[in-house]
Amino acid sequence: MKILLTGGCGFIGSNFVRFALGAGGDLSIVNLDALTYSGNPENLADLGDDNRYRFVKGDIRDLDLMAELIGECDAVVHMAAESHVDRSIIDARPFIQTNVLGTQTLLDALRRADPGNDKRFVHVSTDEVYGSLPLDRPDLLFTEDTPTDPKSPYAASKAASDFLVRAAVHTFGVNACITNCSNNFGPYQFPEKVIPLFVTNLIEGKKVPLYGDGLNVRDWLHVDDHCEAILAVLERGERGRTYNIGGNNERSNIDLTHQILAIMGFGDEMIQPVKDRPGHDRRYAIDAGRIERELGWTPSRSAWPLALRETIAWYKDNPQWWRRVKSGAYRAYYEQQYGSKA
């Protein structure tokens, strides 16, 4: 199987390339990435001589290029997206351009290149499209039937892209599935995200910026578990079906912070309280029962503290990667996002 992967130089995408190629079988990947701020070709630099892997620099809004690449491949895994909530609050326009217009362009290219609807299309999305759960109802979980209720510009853009994929399935018979995942963690994650942000700050002797009261809850999923689930959906998912992917690993932000501090040998004096994010969702929690029942997938790498310790160790062992990432424009963004909120 030859896969067109969009956004393969990002965090989840680059891990998917490594995981999929390492899984064995007759599989190759064409990685299409525009190399925006979080797309880092260094993530996959060591695969340059692997004949199962090819990189193409390009934009998913380029209809002709997308149709050409889809025509060469057997399936599409669509990960290319703007994904950071805080950036969407600052300026939502790139999120609309990439997540909404880009997804529609990709669907148009798929219809042009695959009029018989033979090629599988996996649209990788987020649990944030479901909105927020109350902290006082731990029994409530997001299921695939939970109404869509996005609360941030980022979540709204991803919800729109999900609806476009569903419309393409219903109207044109596109052979697509949608996945909605919880918060990912692992190696090669851009350090605007909370775990690599906190870990690299502490390595540099800086405090960690904790939003609000720290009681917001997220479900944490190791990126390799996520990649395994995406492969299962790609190979065995039902046309038009949505699959929630979670780690069964709910943690409050303050609990996450304390665990990172403890593993790295720091105390609460390294916490810098900052003004809360506007409209900060209180709790995300995934019911991943459907993918377990129908495709036989369950998370096996997401359990803490081991998975968190291994992730922290990766950032400790790879300072040359994240120090380059945290230079230049990132520092200006960090000051804008956290410096004025302390």
Predicted segment positions?
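Residues in well-ordered alpha-helical elements
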Residues: 64-67, 86, 93, 104, ...
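Hydrophobic alpha-helix immediately C-terminal to the catalytic Tyr-X-X-X-Lys motif of short-chain
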Residues: 160, 164, 168, 198, ...
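C-terminal substrate-binding subdomain of Rossmann-fold SDR/epimerase-dehydratase oxidoreductases
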Residues: 15-19, 23-24, 39, 58-61, ...
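Proline-centered helix-kink/hinge sites
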Residues: 92, 150-153, 181, 187, ...
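Short, solvent-exposed loop/helix junctions and linker helices
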Residues: 6, 89, 97-100, 154, ...
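A glycine/serine/threonine-rich, flexible loop-to-helix segment
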Residues: 47, 136-137, 191-199
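Structural element of the ATP-grasp superfamily
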Residues: 106, 165, 198, 291-292
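N-terminal Rossmann-like NAD(P)+-binding domain of SDR-like oxidoreductases, especially those catalyzing
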Residues: 1-184, 315-318, 328-341
